[in-house]
């Protein structure tokens, strides 16, 4: 969305969870920490999430749900909300992308896009 009142920026850091993975059974676990930064001029509440999780074979899992990790945080201008969660895929490499549905203090609903980010076992990519 180009309206500067509704500017939400999303940053992601991922980590492979070797101890929770089982490569022999095609189970690769990853943690991710996401920071949702409100760079707009209005407070906005994170209502829901929509994820597309794609494994290295191109198989896509779609996930929708209310809030993030049981919360629907209200994020004031200049403030951020950080949370951690995880995903399990069946290949050594995959991607996640999606959006958050936000509700601004002026009553407008808008989507905050989450750009694609990579899930990868260390050494899986050259």
From Swiss-Prot:
Residues 2-126 form the ApaG domain. NCBIfam families: PRK05461.1. GO terms for biological process: error-free translesion synthesis. It comes from the Bacteria. The gene is apaG. PROSITE patterns: APAG (PS51087). This is Protein ApaG. InterPro entries: ApaG_domain, ApaG_sf, Uncharacterised_ApaG. It holds the Pfam family DUF525.
């Amino acid at each position: 969305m180009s309206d500067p009142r509704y500017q939400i920026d999303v940053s992601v850091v991922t980590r492979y969870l070797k101890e929770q993975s089982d490569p022999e059974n095609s189970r690769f676990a990853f943690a991710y920490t996401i920071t949702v930064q409100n760079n707009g001029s209005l407070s906005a509440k994170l209502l829901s999430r929509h994820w597309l999780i794609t494994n290295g074979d191109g198989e896509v899992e779609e996930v929708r749900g209310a809030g993030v990790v049981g919360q629907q945080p209200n994020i004031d201008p200049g403030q951020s909300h950080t949370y951690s969660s995880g995903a399990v895929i069946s290949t050594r490499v995959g991607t996640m992308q999606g959006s958050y549905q936000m509700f601004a203090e002026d009553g407008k609903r808008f989507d905050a896009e989450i750009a694609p980010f990579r899930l990868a076992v260390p050494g899986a990519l050259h």
